[in-house]
Amino acid sequence: MIATGHGGAERRTTAGDGTARPVVARTIGELRAARAALTGPVAFVPTMGALHDGHRSLLRIARHHGDHVVVSIFVNPLQFGPAEDFDRYPRTLDADLAMCAAEGVDLVFVPPAAEMYPSEPQVRVSAGPLGERFEGSVRPGHFDGVLTVVAKLFQLVQPDVAVFGRKDAQQLALVRRMVADLNLPVQIIAAPTFREPDGLAASSRNRYLTDADRAQARALPTALTTAAAVAAAGGPPSEMIEMARKVLADAAVTLDYVAVVDEATFDEIDDAEWSQRGEGLCIAAIRVGGTRLIDNMPMRKAD
């Protein structure tokens, strides 16, 4: 059962099976009132909903880093381009709240778009040059939208730590850069990529895949694993990329990009630089059917 508390937020209650349900706040006022009642360190997991086992792993990591866990569920219109999947992005609020309850989340913020953006925002966070390459070049303005909503959520939730998945590596790098550049008092925790049994990185968009699409999509983690084997054997980035491209071409997927980069700056690492450093991140984006997927894997030269 969920009861209404002060300010209209649905307060924390216990279901018939003994599971404690989180407070659900739908307005900024409700969020602030519920947040004020939390004492001790707060860990925050921002999401767009359609929660899956990858999100579950984030919630469990958050629990280790705070006395309280706060989750936001908000499909942010600012980070979608005009031809992207905002309208069809999966929305599964009941299931999302059930997962939050099962994982002991204390507070869930579920604002409508009009609550976050009552008018067209005139001031936004710019992702700068880092936000213009790779994902940013394919999705112009995407990272400005991501950083704007994350900055707003940090301001509203006031977390001590926030947990982001490594699957969205460029987003993680940009959030870290924003926190450093704007002196935001939030520690960013990077969570390992959660992989499904067939190796595909968990993603809300995986549910778009048909069985045939999924069989093709498995080439993405295979390509990255192949590149990692090249790195471990002493091969340079050019060979890693060549071998990854071959795996993806054999699977007949559409390749947006594959590159070996520095995980903090997303500068590409060439063969000469690799010989000095011996580590980096192989990133790739593909399209299968009507679905776009991204993934990455660390590359390390054998000792």
Swiss-Prot record:
It is found in: Cytoplasm. It catalyses: (R)-pantoate + beta-alanine + ATP = (R)-pantothenate + AMP + diphosphate + H(+). Pathway: Cofactor biosynthesis; (R)-pantothenate biosynthesis; (R)-pantothenate from (R)-pantoate and beta-alanine: step 1/1. Its EC number is 6.3.2.1. Residues 1-21 are annotated as: Disordered. Keywords: ATP-binding, Cytoplasm, Ligase, Nucleotide-binding, Pantothenate biosynthesis. GO terms for cellular component: cytosol. It comes from the Bacteria. The keyword ATP-binding applies. It is an enzyme of class 6 (ligase). GO terms for biological process: pantothenate biosynthetic process. Gene3D superfamilies: HUPs (3.40.50.620), Pantoate-beta-alanine ligase, C-terminal domain (3.30.1300.10). The active site is at residue 55. (R)-pantoate binds at residues 79, 171. One of its GO terms (molecular function) is pantoate-beta-alanine ligase activity. ATP binds at residues 48-55, 165-168, 202-205. Beta-alanine binds at residue 79. Catalyzes the condensation of pantoate with beta-alanine in an ATP-dependent reaction via a pantoyl-adenylate intermediate. Homodimer. The reaction proceeds by a bi uni uni bi ping pong mechanism. Belongs to the pantothenate synthetase family. This is Pantothenate synthetase. The gene is panC.
